[in-house]
Amino acid sequence: MQITGRFTIAVHIITCIDYFSPDHQVTSGFLSASTGVNPVIVRGVLSQLKEAGIVNYRQGASGVTLNRPLDQISFYDIYKAVDSVKDEGLFRFHEHPSPDCPVGRNIHSAVDGRLDQVQTAMENEMKEIKLSDVVQDVREQITKEH
């Protein structure tokens, strides 16, 4: 599969923005410390989230804010913003099956449609998962710590 760590970094970032924004200036350095990820990567993810209209972010400015309510941000929105597989598809198929082999000649036609079904099902499920649910779970877990 071709979903990278950028997806979970983005979920972490958005959760931090919501949790800390009322009391703290949320900067890329702050987010880097929370995620344990290099600030350059954090800024790259923030730029992608900004381009998708999920956050408001200007490098060197007064912090990062959310552009829309958490219940209007889905896992799918984040996936499309930072990790969308675009035209190549979620699954990477080996490129050179042998045309001299009967299986090699026919494997693509037997498998491609099914892989597309799996990707569509995953994307549809991602559309149902909202960041408001993630943040609620994180807040409940933090409350239990105290």
Q: Which role does the model predict for each range below?
A:
Residues 1-14:
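Short alpha-helical segments that sit at the start of domains
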Residues 92-146:
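C-terminal regulatory/oligomerization modules of transcriptional regulators
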